[in-house]
Regions:
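Acidic, metal-coordinating helix/loop segments flanking the phosphotransfer/catalytic sites
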Residues: 37-55
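Two-component/phosphorelay signaling modules centered on CheY-like receiver
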Residues: 16-34
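Conserved phosphotransfer microenvironments
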Residues: 53-76
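Hydrophobic anchor at the start of a short beta-strand
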Residues: 33, 83-84
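Hydrophobic/aromatic residues positioned on beta-strands within the core alpha/beta folds
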Residues: 86-88
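Non-catalytic signal-transmission and effector/linker regions of two-component phosphorelay proteins
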Residues: 1-16, 81, 90-138
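Conserved phosphotransfer cores of two-component systems
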Residues: 48-51, 75-81, 90-91
Length: 138
């Protein structure tokens, strides 16, 4: 897979084993991955225009002041139609089209991100992409 800045993925999780497992699997699949363990670190990464982030996975609950919902809002400033993959205590629907998963496994996160990216290469209508994956949120 060719390196494309729109395919750069930011993985935000406080669990280092979960975060690095997902990151390593995505790197092994050929994706460019950046990680963060706090919302503040992730926020700065999202604002770094020299290395734009194309896709975002985050925990809803993060330490300090910036949580996953704030990160999703920041991400949507750049990609209003692309869904964010969010891990929350319970899966649910999102008014923004985000994919909210209830306590996902690393394998689930990997598969959802790969499906989103692959579908975006076939069809730029990311809003349609996310709606097809909402079934994982329930």
């Amino acid at each position: 897979m060719g390196k494309n800045y729109r395919d750069r993925i930011l993985i935000v999780d406080t669990n280092p084993i979960f975060r690095e497992t997902v990151a390593q699997w995505l790197r092994a699949a050929g994706y460019d991955v950046t990680t963060a363990d706090t919302g503040e670190h992730a926020f700065l990464t999202l604002r770094d225009w020299q290395y734009p982030i194309g896709w975002l996975y985050t925990r809803a609950t993060l330490p300090i002041l910036i949580d996953g919902w704030i990160l999703a809002d920041e991400y949507h400033d750049t990609y209003p139609a692309r869904p964010v993959v969010i891990a929350a205590p319970e899966g649910r629907s999102s008014a923004c089209g985000d994919i909210v998963l209830g306590q996902p496994s690393p394998a689930t996160v990997l598969e959802i991100i790969r499906q989103l990216i692959n579908a975006s290469h076939k069809s730029p209508a990311a809003a349609e992409i996310g709606s097809g994956l909402q079934q994982h949120a329930a």
